[in-house]
Amino acid sequence: MPNRGAHFSISRRKDFLMDFSERVFCGHLTPDHTGRRVLLAGWVDAFRDHGGLLFIHLRDRNGIIQIVFSPEAASADVYRQAASLRAEYCVAVQGEVRKRLPGTENPHIETGDIEVFVSELTVLSESEALPFAISDKAMVAGASSAGADHVNEDLRMQYRYLDIRRPAMQKNLILRHRISQCVREFLDSRGFVEVETPVLTMSTPEGARDYLVPSRIHPRSFYALPQSPQLFKQLLMIGGMERYFQLARCFRDEDLRPNRQPEFTQLDIEASFIDEEFLYELIEELTVRMFAIGGIALSRPFPRMTYAEAMDTTGSDRPDLRFGLRMADVTGVFSRTSYSIFKQILQRGGSIKGINIKGQSEKLSKNVLQNEYAKEIAPSFGAKGMTWMRAEEGKLESNIVQFFSADELEALKRVFQVEDGDVLIMVADPSCAIVNSALGQLRLHLGNRLGLIPEGVFYPVWITEFPLFEPTDEGGVTSSHHPFTAPDRTDFDPGNIEELLSLRSRAYDLVVNGEELGGGSIRINDREVQRRIFAALGLTEEDVKNKFGFFLRAFDFAAPPHGGLALGMDRVVSMILQTPSIREVIAFPKNRSAACPLTGAPSEVKREQLAELGLLNLGDKDVLPGDAEKEDRIDHLSWVSRIGIAEGERPVMESILAQAEELAAQVGDLAGNEEPVRSVAPVANRVREGLEAVRLSFSGTGRLLKNAPAVKGDYFKVAGILD
């Protein structure tokens, strides 16, 4: 077996003594270096043998340079060793920088006008065959290149250290570093002090589940990893720090989505003796500077929109304002309608809203509107139906236009400013929330389908005046943001639900292109107001004392007026780099299942560790964590794939799994330095040959929902993690 460690004898030249202090970065070479001898070190990115000349792309963090091995510059020994190099070998070379011959320049790399003719070579470390391609640069103009863009993401994360070698990933991490430096420098210039807050803290209700850490010293007691530094940053204001910030690590045990991770970084900011305008100005200036690092120019001031306006016109409190398709309320148009569906909805206190899709009648045919949108797409967004009309020759036409009066049709044309070629869609429902939600999702769906959302455009907006409380199913209220947000007025009755739901908060969210980048609020600094907020939430004095006693005690010592905001840095960087997921801007992220394919976390622990932490016999269950019997693998396969496997199919599935294990073992034995071979197997059903897929009726959902991870009513409930 070849030695995989670093070795230096392969150069067979005693005069090549490496002094890495003299090293030049590959990407820093320019035509000004022509004629100079340089020492380079990095990884073999790509290899090309031209029979007598060997061309290699050498890559380090700063870029790629082409190095050349020729009989004229290199000895026979060096040339022979160079011929044995493979992808991702780590090497050091010394040679002369030369300009490339006319016509051989490579526009794919920044150093494409020059190359280095190598005279000395040392292999620092060898690499096994790669699980996926790392190189993403073509060696010659016009050639294609293969990267890791289409590699299974879990495979990339299993070998994340290799994935990080890719220039695209390194660029992401370097730009993230520069954005973090920008944050620190800017906030320091504005008098903010960076302070670290505890990671092991107390569990407090903040909207998501806590990650709990057992204490060995205090058996059966637990720390909680912070969902945010909310209470500590307010305590810093009471402590007189006045202006605080932190790039804080936060942890939330919640369902994953493309822009969520169980652990994430947020820019946490808090300041005393300020108001909303101070924070608007501060965050706008910082946001402009951060986006400028990615070459994106934002104009100031950012527009502002109340929560009510955002919901009324876009159906979302995270509005994407890069395109039109604003919603309009036409409830009044149909106040005396004879159309029975609308009439019944209005009699139940409902509402009717619509959107004018300007000039899109050719793309939205009657068939598309009726059979796709009215029957399938709108119901999938929660609407019970959708009404549509097309404007042609000065008239509105649809399959139900005959049910509306001439006055109603004329009123619609006025409200929506209808012109020929326009398409109207309307949603009606007894619930205004359903109307807003369904029509808002239709707005986004149509914007994407019709290509109305411009690329490379960034539209920031402040959303303000959120409701302070939201109703609960039990008839009470819960905080829209968190219970420390200041209300717009303090003379409220904590027992009057109707009054509580009318309160507005002094909260604000920063939204860009339909995505919330952060949010905050002016905080409560009066102990009595804070107590009444807790009372409105149904917390007893005992609850408050147990959960927030230490916090409220601080209010007895003169808390200053204060407020703050937190920005999700993973989201900010992802948006600036325009990546499909925040996982692309995190060095070692968790996957869609909140697991780490690289380390295998989370993992079981030994019974002895559980005993040391006092976690044995906490409940009455016989099976303990880390002590469970192995789960039947067919049942497990059935559950994770959401495919029902009949008892008669189990032997076939066992055979397939056994064959897969045997093949994996054979492949493992063959692993070596060979280049990987890829092939795509044809789609085939080995277990249920000859069976055709059939559409099941929803009248009986037992079979349909057999393997659902969770069921609510007749619905298959899954985590919102699909990209």
From Swiss-Prot:
According to the UniProt entry, what is the EC number of this protein? 6.1.1.23
Residues reported to bind ATP? 252-254, 261, 516, 568-571
Q: Keyword Aminoacyl-tRNA synthetase: yes or no?
A: yes
Its subcellular locations are: Cytoplasm
Name the predominant localization.
Answer: cytoplasm
PROSITE patterns (UniProt xref): AA_TRNA_LIGASE_II
Task: List the residues marked with site Important for tRNA non-discrimination.
Answer: 50, 103
Q: What class of enzyme is it?
A: ligase
Reaction(s) the record says it catalyses: tRNA(Asx) + L-aspartate + ATP = L-aspartyl-tRNA(Asx) + AMP + diphosphate
- Family (UniProt): Belongs to the class-II aminoacyl-tRNA synthetase family. Type 1 subfamily.
Identify the residues that bind L-aspartate: 206, 252, 481, 523
Lineage, opening ranks? Bacteria, Pseudomonadati, Thermodesulfobacteriota, Syntrophia, Syntrophales
Q: Source species, please?
A: Syntrophus aciditrophicus (strain SB)
A GO molecular-function term, please?
Answer: aspartate-tRNA ligase activity
Any idea which UniProt keywords this protein has? Aminoacyl-tRNA synthetase, ATP-binding, Cytoplasm, Ligase, Nucleotide-binding, Protein biosynthesis
The free-text function statement in the UniProt record for this protein reads: Aspartyl-tRNA synthetase with relaxed tRNA specificity since it is able to aspartylate not only its cognate tRNA(Asp) but also tRNA(Asn). Reaction proceeds in two steps: L-aspartate is first activated by ATP to form Asp-AMP and then transferred to the acceptor end of tRNA(Asp/Asn).
Q: Where is this region: Aspartate?
A: 230-233
User: What's the protein name?
Assistant: Aspartate--tRNA(Asp/Asn) ligase 1
Q: Name one GO cellular component term.
A: cytoplasm
Record text on subunit structure and interactions: Homodimer.
GO BP term, example: aspartyl-tRNA aminoacylation
